[in-house]
């Protein structure tokens, strides 16, 4: 049985799903009345919390059932976790959640199946005791599944709540050993409200609202309502990273499937991307103009593989000190007898203006500039009435909007970098 983390930011989009939630709420309250679980009526704020919690649980388990029948979601029910103030937590993750789930999973209601988490002391490889915890899991039970089927609920009946935090700030990555493997990960930071985050949030809400109202069609296996974008910043800074993630076209669809799976304004789509974005931003950083042509095409036989040069340059922008070995995944593109230093020398001989840019850890700042350009572009396209789905340094638009969108991409790039942009069409 597959399990994923619960996402209690899901919300109903359609009246049929709202009807199911209303039925569940009604039966929940009838259960409380019958078993005399309450002595008085809830306060308005507590009633609102109850309704939001039931809605979130039913929506997420509906999504789980539709995408992975028989699958489950896991959730923490510890008071320490649920009682902590946390900007990334849903209102459904409150101290009453455990009690609400217990009633929803009761034999009388049978809306969900709940398997409570537990801790067990198990031996490790050296036969030393370690404590392993199994989280509480939830899945749709018979009463909920029946309603999903009777109402013909599909992914299109689901959306996301506006209460979800869309500006995400992560700490610096730290290494840790998990199951015998070295894993590098970054924790979410519970940052204080500030004008910069507020501005980014307002911009992204405007974009998300525009996408929610857009005429987007997909094949049935994709949820065309899933257009919510989040912006992720790195290294504890709102000036590092900033890429946009989310949306069915990024998280649930292969790149090769986009052209035959999406219609925008009832039109086929094209993908427009900024060519050699990272290198152009590096040139902009030093105030220089790049040479004409493909910036990854190096006129030297030892550096003739474009894919390898692209990986090598990207790694050099992110590296915080001189490198002596080929970056991961790039060695295969070069002859076994060719050394890294010979290739990077050939690259920098062709791009002498970038000698002061490599090995300075500037890659995240270039990524931030890329994200700023994309956000500005999406807002400009919205102003022109053009629906665009972002993919890091590219946008998906309808074929009829190709020329206008390409012009907007060039204008935004020039305005923000002082350089001409190369636009590729797929």
Predicted region positions:
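Polymerase palm active-site segment centered on the conserved acidic dipeptide of motif C
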Residues: 402-426
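Acidic, glycine-rich two-metal-ion catalytic cores of nucleic acid-processing enzymes
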Residues: 122, 126-308, 392-394
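Active-site palm subdomain of RNA-directed nucleic acid polymerases
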Residues: 372-391
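Short amphipathic alpha-helical interface segments
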Residues: 25-90
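Short amphipathic alpha-helical interaction segments
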Residues: 88-108, 114
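Intrinsically disordered, low-structural-confidence terminal and linker regions
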Residues: 1-13
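Short beta-strand-to-loop capping motifs
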Residues: 397-400
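Helical catalytic core of nucleic-acid polymerases
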Residues: 44-48, 71-94, 245, 249-361, ...
């Amino acid at each position: 049985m597959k399990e994923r983390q619960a996402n209690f930011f899901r919300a109903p989009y359609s009246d049929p799903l709202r009807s199911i939630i209303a039925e569940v709420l009604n039966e929940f309250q009838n259960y409380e009345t019958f078993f005399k679980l309450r002595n008085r009526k809830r306060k308005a704020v507590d009633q609102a919390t109850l309704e939001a919690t039931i809605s979130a649980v039913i929506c997420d388990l509906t999504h789980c059932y539709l995408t992975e029948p028989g699958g489950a979601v896991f959730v923490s029910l510890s008071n320490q976790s649920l009682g902590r103030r946390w900007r990334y937590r849903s209102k459904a993750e409150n101290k009453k959640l455990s009690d609400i789930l217990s009633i929803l999973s009761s034999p009388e209601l049978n809306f969900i199946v709940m398997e409570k988490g537990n801790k067990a002391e198990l031996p490790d490889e050296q036969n030393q005791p370690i404590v392993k915890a199994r989280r509480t899991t939830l899945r749709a039970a018979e009463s909920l599944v029946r309603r999903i089927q009777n109402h013909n609920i599909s992914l299109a009946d689901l959306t996301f709540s506006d209460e979800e935090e869309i500006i995400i700030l992560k700490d610096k990555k730290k290494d840790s050993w998990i199951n015998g493997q070295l894993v590098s990960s970054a924790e979410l930071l519970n940052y204080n409200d500030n004008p910069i985050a507020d501005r980014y949030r307002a911009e992204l809400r405007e974009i998300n609202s525009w996408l929610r109202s857009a005429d987007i069609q997909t094949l049935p296996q994709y949820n065309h309502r899933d257009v919510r974008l989040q912006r992720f910043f790195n290294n504890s800074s709102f000036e590092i990273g900033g890429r946009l993630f989310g949306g069915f076209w990024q998280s649930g669809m292969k790149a090769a499937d986009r052209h035959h799976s999406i219609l925008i304004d009832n039109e086929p789509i094209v993908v427009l991307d900024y060519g050699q974005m990272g290198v152009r931003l590096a040139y902009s950083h030093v105030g220089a103009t790049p040479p004409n042509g493909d910036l990854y095409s190096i006129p030297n036989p030892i550096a003739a593989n474009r894919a390898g040069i692209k990986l090598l340059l990207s790694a050099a922008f992110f590296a915080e000190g001189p490198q002596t070995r080929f970056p991961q995944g790039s060695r295969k593109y070069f002859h076994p007898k060719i050394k890294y230093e010979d290739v990077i020398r050939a690259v920098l001989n062709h791009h002498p203006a970038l000698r002061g840019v490599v090995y300075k850890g500037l890659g995240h700042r270039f990524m931030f500039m890329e994200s700023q350009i994309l956000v500005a572009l999406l807002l400009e396209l919205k102003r022109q009435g053009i629906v665009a789905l972002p993919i890091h340094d590219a946008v998906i638009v309808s074929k009829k909007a190709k020329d206008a969108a390409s012009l907007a991409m060039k204008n935004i790039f020039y305005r923000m970098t002082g350089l001409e942009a190369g636009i590729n069409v797929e």
